[in-house]
């Protein structure tokens, strides 16, 4: 009941500036080099199966990075196979942020919504689905080395 009283105080000052033809479900896909998503943004894209994002992420494999915005540590991972980045990032959403990774699992156990509050997802390198898995894994190792994510001071990669 208190909520409606609060709305009553502001109702006459509110302006409807636009009525969208469909409910807002996030930003459109604008390119692999533009991906920089908070966990809630990624979760929204995956759970609503946003068609433009799904089409783009299902048809590419690649190297991605998860940044812990609380402490600056990073995790570099790769996605390869028939459903590409989409499938791998869906694993993170389904697992509340760890994607089956031991170190990330230990991190998110600290706080109930740790990943939701602190994880940021970005693409480092998009790779055609026709490229062989071993090449994707070599590129992942390159990024781990460059970004020092195997050093506990800077990252969450254990291998």
Model-based region annotation:
Residues 40, 87, 102, 134-137:
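Generic alpha-helical secondary structure signal
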Residues 1-80:
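GIY-YIG nuclease catalytic motif and its immediate N-terminal context
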């Amino acid at each position: 009941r208190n909520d409606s009283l609060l709305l009553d105080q502001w109702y006459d000052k509110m302006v409807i500036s636009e009525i969208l033809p469909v409910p807002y479900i996030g930003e459109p896909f604008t390119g692999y080099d533009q991906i920089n998503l908070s966990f809630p943004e990624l979760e929204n894209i995956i759970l609503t199966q946003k068609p433009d994002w799904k089409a783009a992420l299902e048809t590419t494999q690649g190297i991605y990075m998860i940044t812990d915005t609380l402490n600056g540590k990073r995790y570099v991972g790769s996605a390869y196979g028939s459903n590409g980045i989409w499938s791998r990032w869906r694993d993170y959403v389904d697992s509340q942020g760890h994607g089956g990774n031991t170190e990330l699992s230990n991190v998110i156990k600290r706080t109930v919504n740790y990943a939701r509050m602190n994880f940021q997802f970005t693409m480092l390198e998009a790779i055609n689905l026709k490229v062989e898995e071993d090449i994707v894994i070599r590129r992942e190792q390159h990024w781990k080395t460059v970004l020092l994510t195997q050093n506990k001071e800077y990252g969450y990669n254990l291998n």
